[in-house]
Design a protein with these regions (language model features):
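Sequence/structural signature of beta-propeller modules
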Residues: 2-111
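Surface loop/turn motifs at the tips and blade-to-blade linkers of beta-strand repeat domains
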Residues: 112-117, 160-164, 217-222, 282-287, ...
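Conserved beta-strand position repeated once per blade in WD40 beta-propeller domains
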Residues: 120-123, 170, 226-228, 293, ...
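Residue-level detector of Asp-centered blade-edge/turn motifs that repeat once per structural unit
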Residues: 126-128, 173-177, 231-233, 296-298
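Short loop/turn segments immediately following the C-termini of beta-strands
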Residues: 136-138, 185-187, 240-244, 299, ...
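Structural motif
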Residues: 140-147, 188-199, 244-257, 309-320
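Loop/turn-rich, solvent-exposed surfaces of beta-rich toroidal or solenoidal domains
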Residues: 280-329, 334, 341
Length: 343
């Protein structure tokens, strides 16, 4: 009897251990599945969220947590400047660029509004209480657009459609005349186009079914292809992007009085045909190739350089170097993530 009980005890013990191992393995597998699921959720594209007009307002690729993790791992200095340094601005540091998944825009082929899924962000500027982001359809089937966001909250407000499909590589705001300027082309020449902040605020595609109407279309014969524009000290600074050589930056003073108040035509006019005005820059300087953006901050001129999937760079020049913006003269160079556009 005792021998039987010993055998029974051993058998129960073995079964108990086996059950424990099985349960532990099952529990461990469950935890593994949960971790993998959480990892997949963490790295995958968030569920698509749309505004009332059908424009996507959710991130196009990753959620903010994953974005910050990747940024911290690959570009720790940029992460520190963005998220760990006391903020110098009340404008949000992390804003979702709308329309990356879908943007309703006029389809040139179908002659109606359809969903564009290839909008490529280009320029950005702060205009009054708004943050404006320009974008074009990389398939060239839809009108180019400007997304309008609340600059404090980053909330998407509306989309402004512009005439045609310009690249919209640059966008700037003149706070004196309250005009918004964008880069484009006119009759095979680079051009600057503008419309007022008041017109932007009133714009609604659903009301007139038309793109916004420009107040000024000004051709720039001295610029091969305008890729960036910025406002500084009552001037517009315009540059063109060149993939294999030196580029150029030209400054255009904005008239503050007279018949051409608020535009860059004043005494620079060479010829006027209808609404097309030809202007020559009052001052110009060479700039490094592959430049996508230019900004003035305190005593610095900052250029962004980007091309393809390689790291981008920010070049910091003293403002006295305006006539010699060669990368060798930069006092500071900061490595940034790829595809850096306007700054």
């Amino acid at each position: 009897m005792k021998k039987f009980l010993k055998i029974l005890f051993k058998l129960v013990l073995i079964l108990g251990i086996a059950a424990g191992v099985a349960y532990g393995g099952y529990y461990g597998y469950q935890q593994y599945q949960k971790r993998e699921q959480a990892k997949a959720t963490f790295t995958s594209r968030p569920d698509v969220e749309k505004a009332k007009d059908g424009t996507s307002i959710s991130p196009g690729h990753h959620n903010l947590a994953y974005f910050k993790k990747q940024l911290n791992e690959k570009y720790p200095d940029v992460y520190s400047a963005a998220y760990e340094t006391p903020r110098a601005s009340k404008i949000g540091s992390s804003v979702v660029i709308p329309g990356q998944i879908v943007t309703p825009s006029y389809d040139f082929n179908k002659k109606k509004i359809t969903d564009a899924d290839s909008m490529t962000p280009q320029g950005l500027t702060v205009a009054g209480k708004y943050l404006l982001i320009s974008a074009y359809d990389s398939t060239h089937n839809h009108r180019s657009v400007i997304y309008c966001l609340d600059k404090k909250t980053g909330k998407y407000l509306k989309t402004i459609q512009v005439p045609g499909a310009p690249h919209l590589g640059g966008i700037a705001y003149d706070p004196v005349a309250k005009n918004i300027w964008v880069t484009g082309s006119q009759d095979d020449s680079s051009a600057l186009m503008s419309f007022s902040l008041k017109k932007l605020e009133k714009y609604s595609y659903n009301k007139k079914k038309q793109p916004i109407k420009y107040d000024n279309v000004i051709s720039l014969p001295t610029i091969e292809r305008a890729s960036c524009v910025t406002y500084y000290d009552n001037q517009l600074f315009v540059g063109f992007f060149n993939t294999d050589g030196q580029g150029q930056i030209a400054s255009y003073p904005i008239a503050r009085s007279g018949d051409f108040k608020g535009t860059i035509t004043s005494d620079q006019i060479k010829a006027v045909t209808g609404q097309v005005s030809w202007a020559l820059g009052s001052g110009s300087a060479s700039m490094d190739r592959q430049i996508q953006g230019i900004a003035f901050y305190q005593n610095w001129i900052i250029l962004s350089q980007s091309y393809g999937s390689k790291d981008s760079k920010l070049y910091f020049f003293p403002i006295s170097a305006l006539n010699n913006l060669d990368e060798g003269n930069a006092e500071k160079v900061v490595t940034m993530p790829p595809y850096l556009e306007q700054i």
